[in-house]
From Swiss-Prot:
The lineage of its organism: Eukaryota, Amoebozoa, Evosea, Eumycetozoa, Dictyostelia. It holds the Pfam family CAF1C_H4-bd. GO terms for biological process: ribosome biogenesis. It is found in: Nucleus, Nucleolus. Its main location: nucleus. This is Glutamate-rich WD repeat-containing protein 1. It comes from the Eukaryota. InterPro entries: G-protein_beta_WD-40_rep, Glutamate-rich_WD_repeat, Histone-bd_RBBP4-like_N, WD40/YVTN_repeat-like_dom_sf, WD40_repeat_dom_sf, WD40_rpt. Residues 1-75, 148-180 are annotated as: Disordered. Coiled coil: none annotated. Residues 27-63, 157-180 have a biased composition (Acidic residues).
Amino acid sequence: MSSKKRSFGDIEFGESDEVGGTNVDVNGEDDFENDDEVESFEDDEQSFEEIEEGGEEGGDNDGEDKGPKKVWRAGVDPLEEDEVLDYDSTAYDMMHSMSVEWPCLSFHPIKDELGAQRNKYPHTMYLVAGTQADEAKNNKVIIMKAKQLHKTKHDDEDSDDDEDSDDDEESDDEDDEDKDVDPELQLAFINHNGAVNRIRSMDQQSNIVATWSDNRSVYIWNIANHLKALDNETVAPKQTAPLHTISNHSIEGYALDWSPKIAGRLATGDCNNSIFVTNASESTWKTDTQAFKGHTESVEDIQWSPSEEKVFASCSIDQTVRIWDIRKPKPAITVKAHTADVNVISWSRNVEYLLVSGCDDGSFRVWDLRAFKDNSPVSDFKYHTGPITSIEWNPYEESQVIVSSSDDQVTIWDFSLEEDTEEFTNANANPDDDFQYPPQLFFIHQGQHDIKEVHWHPQIPHVAISTSIDGFNIFKSSNSEE
């Protein structure tokens, strides 16, 4: 993927756009235009928008029955000038949208001390992101606290319907007593030298964050004071010096990953085919002087092994995925994984021999590392019509991955699903053609433009966050397991 593809296009910032999703085994595609801005914190150019009611043109007309909903397919079905997509809140348990001053190519959820596997609404979460501003001097690392993220399912129902609700809804209210309270977004900033190509927080110490800058430097930051300022609602200093700067790279890059096994171990890959490993010591950081060389074109992504502290994987524009042992400068295994650029990879934390790769041609493949060789994926999916920009295994469901693409879709896939019933076939067939959704396609989220990354939240099961030129979406599909 070229650097031009990685960056946001020349789109005017600040325009409102549409958001929506599809629970593909239940509902049709849903979408609508955001209208209501909710409380912003510290800067009126940052806003939090609650997803509420469907688009005016796309909804029901005087109660007229328009028949079964039909899923709209990005890149396949035309959308006429007088047509809009409908948003149905029942497709989501939760759906919120937020915007900041400049779009963010990359972000990462921050592990917090609020507990793991928390399901009770409203939710609170912390994120860290990096901007792509109009000028290099305007770029920032943004530390975010989003709170009062309440359940939005059935938000578009009339109050009369609420009065008719039964014990089931009363039970829901017990889990979300503050559902009518507006969500809030609090922000803290660090001035950043250059656009942020990628940003990641350390697993073991989430206040330690690494950023890949387009000025060819990798910076390591301590954002502990900024997180504390968000909790205390005070102002943190924007002029914060990095803990360390990695200057070994001769050109900018995008590949960046912290080891889940060794605290302070960071791998970085650049557009000149080089990979460096940095380790933290008691008083400083040390980057190996010898680069890991093997790729013949730009290194696009890196993933450390979830079980082997000295092993990592990388992918490249050279169409390969390579497995490395840091005790050797050359790759241990090289596999031609795709027939185009390999943009992203994810190594499963739950099933340590599974790796998934996303390609510039819109396909993604699942690999069994116990039998890792050329053109031998376990599965090969060719649903998306644009390059895959992000991919990640679900930490709470070993058979699921979430995928984002430049075709303006985020999709959730469940490899445990099979097309084994006539009911499924009939529910997803389009009467106008022979197109059918793959049986493993679990959910479709649409409405954002130029989507760059998507991540699962590590402590709130089945909640996903995506970033695009429009801002961020935080959502949970209604068909997710609790």
